[in-house]
């Protein structure tokens, strides 16, 4: 229940019983198991990788974790700022902040601005640990939105990808007209 209203969300999992996939993730320096309860950073190889590889990485995590493009109803023609969020246990809060800062720096290479990084206590877990919610908020300036949704976009999420394409076409048309 959130603000007096019952909210329902869909959640999907993929279960793969292949040790080879686990070995590959380990070799690529990706987190294994619960991401909220461990330290991890952007892999070193990714920081020096070509832009196309960085784009694929960002598009895949944005497909899962970046908010869906949606217009502001109060200000016609504008969009809400995209938000990339993650949760971390209190012990790993600084690691989460650093990870989001690394994502922000990688996005700058594509001409995408991040405007804020917010943290707030979310809840206490069953074991009594405090979980923190962190949000990397991107600029809602048209140029930054076009760069985010056109240059990076969303992989593995057809709905977000479709809405992002519509938004890019609208913003590009609006820019030409005005």
Predicted regions mapped to residue ranges:
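Internal intein/HINT superfamily modules and their associated LAGLIDADG
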Residues: 1-178
């Amino acid at each position: 229940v959130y603000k007096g209203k019952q909210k329902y969300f869909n959640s999907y999992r993929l279960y793969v019983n292949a040790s080879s996939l686990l070995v590959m993730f380990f070799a690529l320096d990706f987190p294994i198991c619960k991401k909220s309860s461990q330290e991890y950073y952007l892999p070193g190889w990714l920081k020096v990788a070509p832009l196309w590889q960085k784009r694929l990485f960002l598009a895949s995590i944005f497909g899962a974790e970046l908010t869906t493009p949606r217009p502001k109803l109060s200000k016609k023609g504008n969009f809400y700022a995209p938000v990339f969020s993650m949760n971390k246990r209190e012990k790993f809060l600084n690691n989460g902040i650093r990870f989001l800062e690394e994502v922000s720096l990688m996005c700058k290479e594509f001409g995408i601005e991040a405007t804020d990084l917010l943290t707030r206590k979310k809840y206490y877990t069953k074991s009594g640990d405090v979980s923190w919610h962190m949000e990397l908020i991107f600029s809602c300036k048209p140029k930054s939105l076009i760069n985010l949704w056109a240059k990076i976009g969303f992989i593995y999420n057809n709905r977000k990808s479709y809405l992002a394409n519509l938004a890019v076409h609208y913003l590009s048309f609006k820019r030409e007209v005005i």
